[in-house]
């Protein structure tokens, strides 16, 4: 019975809410963009358009999955499944406030799995056997790999400040003050890097509708497309939850774990709304600007900050207290 709970019910209890949150994030996005463009957004299906995501999901999954005759059959269908599997597995070490698996190296696990997501994009672009998909996929891979570097270095700095690799440690470290306050340059670079990592505007070069039709998923329709869509939005929510854990640590009251969960979800939701706000406000970056930003601005800065955070405790450790 215990194994049933830990291996079946526990994972389901966090997969289902994540998928529901993803569904309603799509609705929120359409509503926010609608109001920013002085229109209503979805308002027909259900009260205030609240059932729109359910109608969308149903429509996508009952469509026929069309596969291009020249595509690689196995890879074409395996990559969307891989994308969603990775997006959902990433939630396992998240302290909301108790994780599904409390990993010792939770931060590294998140970093490793999020860089594996590149392979789903790589496979789908190549398996589609289409020029547009290939160009979109090459852009996506270059962008994701480039921003992984800055994300990794920012994480390293934050780990040095916090003193632990488990995501639970961040809650303890931020009991007196949010990490956002002393490490605001890190937080700003982290947030921009997560935008690029999740292929969101203004870094949505992979799916630039004006030039690439739809990017790496141009040949996908129906079910497999829905899986990619779910994976993308699950990643957005995950990155924002991670940002909230790292820089806006939820104060954990052991007697009321529900409050911590509510606290964290509210912060993640607000950060996600800022994602949508950015999408409505900024034009798309040019490819070379995107690469200049990470390699010429973020990389030197993050490297300097890693060295600074390493040197500071070592330099001050030899001094007597209360100088």
UniProtKB/Swiss-Prot annotation:
Keywords: Electron transport, Membrane, Mitochondrion, Mitochondrion inner membrane, NAD, Respiratory chain, Translocase, Transmembrane, Transmembrane helix, Transport, Ubiquinone. Its EC number is 7.1.1.2. It is a multi-pass membrane protein. One of its GO terms (cellular component) is mitochondrial inner membrane. The chain crosses the membrane at residues 8-28, 74-94, 105-125, 145-165, 176-196, 236-256, 258-278, 298-318. Pfam families: NADHdh (PF00146). GO terms for biological process: aerobic respiration. GO terms for molecular function: NADH dehydrogenase (ubiquinone) activity. It is an enzyme of class 7 (translocase). It is found in: Mitochondrion inner membrane. It catalyses: a ubiquinone + NADH + 5 H(+)(in) = a ubiquinol + NAD(+) + 4 H(+)(out). Core subunit of the mitochondrial membrane respiratory chain NADH dehydrogenase (Complex I) that is believed to belong to the minimal assembly required for catalysis. Complex I functions in the transfer of electrons from NADH to the respiratory chain. The immediate electron acceptor for the enzyme is believed to be ubiquinone. Belongs to the complex I subunit 1 family. This is NADH-ubiquinone oxidoreductase chain 1. The lineage of its organism: Eukaryota, Metazoa, Chordata, Craniata, Vertebrata.
């Amino acid at each position: 019975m215990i194994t049933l709970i830990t291996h079946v019910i526990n994972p389901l209890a966090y997969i289902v809410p994540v998928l529901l949150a993803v569904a309603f994030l799509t609705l929120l996005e359409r509503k926010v963009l609608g109001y920013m463009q002085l229109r209503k957004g979805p308002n027909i299906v259900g009260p205030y358009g609240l059932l729109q995501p359910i109608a969308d999901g149903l429509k996508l999954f009952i469509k026929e999955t069309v596969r291009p005759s020249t595509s690689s059959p196995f890879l074409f269908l395996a990559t969307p499944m891989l994308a969603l599997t990775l997006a959902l597995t990433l939630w396992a070490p998240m302290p909301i406030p108790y994780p599904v698996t409390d990993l010792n190296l939770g931060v590294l696990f998140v970093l490793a799995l999020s860089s594996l997501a590149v392979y789903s994009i790589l496979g789908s672009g190549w398996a589609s056997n289409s020029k547009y998909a290939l160009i979109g996929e090459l852009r996506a891979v270059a962008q994701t790999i480039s921003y992984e570097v800055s994300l990794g270095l920012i994480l390293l700095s934050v780990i040095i400040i916090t003193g632990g690799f488990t995501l639970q440690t961040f809650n303890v470290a931020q009991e007196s003050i949010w990490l956002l306050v002393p490490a605001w340059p890190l937080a700003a670079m982290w947030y921009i890097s997560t935008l690029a990592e999740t292929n969101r505007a203004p870094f949505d070069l992979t799916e630039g509708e004006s030039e690439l039709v739809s990017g790496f998923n141009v040949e996908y329709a129906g079910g497999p497309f829905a899986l990619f869509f779910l994976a993308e939005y699950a990643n957005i929510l995950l990155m924002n939850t991670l940002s909230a854990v790292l820089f806006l640590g939820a104060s954990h009251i052991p007697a009321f774990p529900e409050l911590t969960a509510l606290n964290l979800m509210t912060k993640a939701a607000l950060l996600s709304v800022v994602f949508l706000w950015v999408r409505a406000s900024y034009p798309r970056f040019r490819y070379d600007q995107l690469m200049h930003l990470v390699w010429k601005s973020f990389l030197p800065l993050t490297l300097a900050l890693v060295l600074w955070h390493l040197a500071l405790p070592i330099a001050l450790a030899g001094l007597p207290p209360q100088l």
